[in-house]
């Protein structure tokens, strides 16, 4: 009797040990595919035991070649291709990116043209986790460039050096990327050509072949029974890889008498960098006026601030003490 009891105890301990080994957690992973099937075995013929969705947390309990056996939060276990999973480091990186840009100012709203992945850094081959649906609305925060099919970000030391690199036929092809925030507050990098900057139609028609990068409402004017916004717009040439985020600034004000937008101010030849600050400031007898501050690079590649004020319909530079303008501001009333 004692012998049988001992054998039974040893058998139970052995089975328990095997069970723990079979179901031990190797690591935590997250599903990067829009949706993936869990299969009961790694074979050409299998049964579906469950489904996991994008961003879902799973525990890896076993691996076999290109497959991983995972356990979901509900306890379902099954095999999934490892290419549909990303590790904890990638998840933590996206969480940090979101936290670091939680309060980053919005430069423009955008709409996704296609299903798009949120990457942890600019580049088509960089790690990504979340996938956004076509038509999703996002907030554009920043811009960067990356080499096509490369993971490294192109960060030119000086604008002049970058321009020479772009002109060189042997130079790498660059793509523009936007740092965006989605409706759920998640932040990541997306290929800029996948995003349409959601510019109001009333001013989009004045693009003149240039690309809108960002726009801001400076203030509103009363026209009859409605208020009409007046805009600051940042534009650039319609190609990727520029060493600056924008090179043109335009201000569109509303002509109350003619009921139309007019170009109150434009400036070219800038090497502007996002973000742009829009605020209000008191100017004594002029009252409280809309103010915008641009960050631009000088000839040495240093980033400096340039402040402007709008006293409708005139835009003027606001010079810092001792500052001398390189060239006078040129207010315009010509319709574009």
What annotation goes with each model-predicted range?
Residues 265-336:
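Hydrophilic extracytoplasmic domains
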Residues 25-26, 40-63, 120-143, 149:
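SH3/SH3-like (including bacterial SH3b) beta-barrel domains
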Residues 65-71, 146-157:
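Short, Lys/Arg- and Gly-enriched loop/turn segments at beta-strand edges
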Residues 19-33, 59, 71-110, 154-227, ...:
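Boundary regions of SH3-family modules and the immediately adjacent low-complexity/disordered segments
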